[in-house]
A protein has these predicted regions:
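Peripheral docking tails and interdomain loops at the edges
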Residues: 272-273, 386-388, 408, 529, ...
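Non-catalytic terminal/interface segments that mediate subunit docking, oligomerization
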Residues: 65, 248-358, 363-373, 472-475
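Glycine-rich ThDP/TPP pyrophosphate-binding loop and its adjacent helix/strand module
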Residues: 73, 108-265, 270-278, 282-283, ...
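A glycine-rich helix N-cap at a beta->alpha junction
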Residues: 86-96, 161-175, 369-381
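Cofactor-binding active-site loop characterized by glycine-rich and histidine/acidic residues
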Residues: 41-162, 299, 304, 313-314
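N-terminal amphipathic, basic-rich helices that act as targeting or association modules
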Residues: 1-79, 215
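Active-site nucleophile and cofactor-binding loops and adjacent substrate-binding regions
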Residues: 39-48, 67-72, 100-120, 142-146, ...
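Glycine/charged-rich beta-loop-alpha catalytic/anionic-binding loops adjacent to active sites
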Residues: 29-36, 97-111, 133-139, 313-328, ...
Length: 586
């Protein structure tokens, strides 16, 4: 096998054209084996194999700098740059991340995981090169939906003025995570249909030179194209037409399903570990919203390129029709659009992963909350037990969203409470509202939840009234609070009060004052970073009093590829550890 002899780009350059084709197939086979056993981004990487081989054949990495957008399509790059063991040896699978990582290799220049940043980053590298009088090619590899993000437009706009070497490889696989949306992609389609000859050309209109490669999975065609632009003295876009999922029939046929996958059976494509029949908040949310859409044509679902985050499968998107909008990977636009829909009398619901809502902070503040428009944002997967890559942490949404004036950020503890908050959030007309969807499974508390959270603004629920110690368990950590209260009583006899705060954004001053009468310690629990979070609001309120406060959450750091249980233990977020601490300070 040729792949066994590849320890770096220099080894790729020694191969003949025919050998490069064989190498590409070997790389694809290695990728499929690891992906089926370990999981990861399937379609994006299978479609980029030939382009990656050609890049390392023509260019001279790391002297020539290649920046991969999102870098979820960099697996073949890692194989060819000395990290093949992590793809061929099951014992080493976890030795590399799923994204570019400079600590792994000199061929990686940035830790990247969010979209549409490659052109901006590469523009910076090119500018630094020019300022120092250096040489070498700078290449941004972007595609798989990333061009729909606003920063990509900003980067291209600036790149056109560089006047020096700058190459953008546009991986056009006609897909994002789901299907592409927007006028840009109609132009890419026109360029494909005319072999790049259409006079209406987005890239030349932006001021870049342009080259089209009809078969972006043909190694020799790619080599020829890359040779034409190597050492070019001005910005150029190389538009390559690729097939997402190339070489694996099921991934070619089910491109959305195989964008990313947990371990799966190669023969059938079925997940190796069954997901069971457990309820899922995304699925339940889509069913509920479709019912609301049928009753009220002003209800509209919005996604920024991740429709299944709240259960909108292709069939459900079709059923929703004009009442579902995929804006592309453009969270900023999604929030501003939702604000304006609400201002115009509509009922927008924007579903988004916790890790991606931070991309729209300015729009949350300026376009939504300053205008006080009643849009609803559903924040999924917030907490330590969801995504664990350093680029996709879901630990920061509480301080990000929870400190913006006018925002009402809710933290339901169970299924009943979530749907009550969802219904109120859609139909109320007074506040921008966000809901932190529980991330610990669909649980029932068997309660009759409140209906009007506007009348109850910043009023906490006392789930159990005791004394001496009060435990405030926020959202997904309410159940941890139940464990703490139970264990504390078991070990000390103290019957602690258990509180469901419900509101991340507000303080129930009346309740906190009342707790002073017969409590000496308040414990706060939140599934997110402590700094700037919910617990600090409680500690600040009690600061001048004699009340002791213990805040529990995740310390402020960029944890990477952690084990959730270990992270919780490291932050003393188990019932056993919390009770130990309570006994020490009482």
């Amino acid at each position: 096998m040729y792949i066994e002899k590849i320890n770096g780009p220099a080894d790729v350059k020694r191969l003949s054209a025919g050998e490069l084709e064989t190498l590409s197939e070997e790389v694809r086979g290695v990728l499929l084996k690891k992906l089926s056993e370990h999981g990861g981004h399937v379609g994006p990487n299978l479609g980029m194999v030939e382009a990656t081989v050609a890049l390392h054949y023509v260019f001279n990495s790391p002297a020539d700098k290649i920046v991969y957008d999102v870098s979820h399509q960099s697996y073949a790059h890692k194989i060819l740059t000395g990290r093949k063991a992590a793809f061929m040896d099951a014992a080493a699978y976890d030795e590399v991340s799923g994204y570019t990582e400079p600590s792994e290799s000199e061929h990686d220049f940035f830790v990247i995981g969010h979209t549409s940043t490659s052109v901006s980053l590469a523009t910076g590298l090119a500018k630094a090169r020019d300022l120092k009088g250096g040489t070498g090619n700078v290449i941004a590899v972007i595609g798989d939906g990333s061009l729909s993000g606003g920063e990509a437009f900003e980067g291209l706009n600036n790149a056109a003025e560089l006047g020096t070497n700058f190459i953008v490889i546009v991986n056009d696989n006609q897909m994002s995570i789901a299907e592409n949306h927007g006028g840009l992609y109609r132009n890419l389609q026109l360029l494909r249909e005319t072999d790049g000859q259409a006079p209406c050309n987005f890239f030349t209109a932006m001021g870049l030179d342009y080259l089209y490669v009809k078969d972006g999975n043909n190694v020799q065609a790619l080599i020829d194209a890359f040779r034409k632009v190597k050492d070019i003295g001005h910005p150029v876009a190389v538009h390559i037409n690729t097939l997402k999922g190339k070489g694996y029939r099921l991934a070619e046929q089910q491109q959305e399903r195989f964008h990313y996958s947990a371990p799966f059976c190669l023969e059938t494509g079925s997940p190796s570990v069954g997901s069971g029949n457990e309820d899922d908040y995304g699925d339940l949310t889509a069913k509920y919203l479709l019912q609301e859409m049928k009753k009220d044509r002003t209800v509209v679902g919005i996604t920024a390129g991740t429709p299944t985050v709240f259960g909108f499968t292709p069939e459900r998107r079709e059923e929703a029709g004009r009442q579902f909008v995929d804006v592309g990977i453009a969270e900023e636009h999604a929030v501003a659009m939702a604000s304006a829909i609400a201002a115009g009398g509509g009922k927008p619901v924007f579903g988004v992963y916790s890790t991606f809502i931070q991309r729209a902070y300015d729009q949350l503040s300026q376009d939504l909350c300053i205008n006080n428009n009643p849009a609803l944002i559903l924040v999924f997967w917030g907490g330590a037990s969801t995504m664990n890559d350093v680029t996709h942490l879901c630990l920061f949404d509480i301080p990000v969203i929870g400190n913006i004036p006018n925002m009402v950020y809710l933290a339901p503890t169970c299924r009943e409470e979530y749907f009550a908050m969802l219904e109120w959030g859609i139909h109320q007309t007074e506040h921008p509202v966000a809901i932190r969807v529980p991330a610990n499974g669909v649980l029932s508390r068997g309660i009759e939840p409140e209906k009007d959270y506007g009348k109850l603004l910043n009023r906490y629920e006392v789930a159990h009234r005791g004394g001496q110690v009060a435990v405030l368990g926020l959202g997904s950590f309410f159940q941890l609070g139940e464990e703490v209260v139970g264990k504390l009583k078991e070990e000390t006899g103290v019957d602690a009060t258990l509180v469901n705060p419900r509101f991340i954004t507000g303080v129930d001053e009346a309740l906190l004052e009342d707790l002073k009468r017969d409590h000496t310690l308040v414990v706060t629990l939140e599934d997110g970073v402590l700094d700037g979070g919910f617990g600090e609001k409680i500690a600040r309120y009690y600061g001048a009093s004699g009340m002791k406060v213990l805040n529990y959450g995740i310390r402020k750091e960029f944890a990477d590829r952690y084990d959730a249980g270990e992270l919780l233990r490291d932050n003393r977020l188990t019932a056993l550890q919390i009770v130990e601490d309570i006994k020490k300070v009482r």
